[in-house]
């Protein structure tokens, strides 16, 4: 029974971490999200090793199934928010590239070039 409690506790830790990651993604705190992701991945790896040998009770399996469902829902939402951020960053990179092209083009003119509307 103690092993089952430990396993349930490990899954709860993963769920808590995924909820924290979802909150960080929602408020666009990307740096902290990336830092927390390493802790999350280690917790998942440790729990996977425990789960293989421990999951025999149907009641425990149902409890874990509920936690896994919530974890997966959080993962889906985090991925959606990350994709939105990636799209925004791609747009900004595109704008920057276009601006650099404009700057290179207009930078070819001599410093004394007349601006539109100026007289000599």
UniProtKB/Swiss-Prot annotation:
**What is the annotated localization of this protein?**
Cytoplasm, Cytosol
Pfam families in UniProt: FliT
| Key words, A-Z | Bacterial flagellum biogenesis, Chaperone, Cytoplasm, Repressor, Transcription, Transcription regulation
Q: Can you quote a single GO CC term? A: cytosol
Q: Which domain of life does this protein belong to?
A: Bacteria
Q: Which InterPro entries match?
A: FliT
Spans annotated as FliD binding: 60-98
- Tell me one GO biological process term: protein folding
Q: Which Gene3D superfamilies match?
A: Flagellar protein flit (1.20.58.380)
Answer whether the UniProt record assigns the keyword Protease to this protein. Answer: no
Give the region (Required for homodimerization) as residue ranges. 1-50
Q: How does it assemble?
A: Homodimer. Interacts with FliD and FlhC.
**Family in the record:** Belongs to the FliT family.
What this protein is called in its record is Flagellar protein FliT
- Organism of origin is Yersinia pestis (strain Pestoides F)
Q: What is the lineage of its organism?
A: Bacteria, Pseudomonadati, Pseudomonadota, Gammaproteobacteria, Enterobacterales
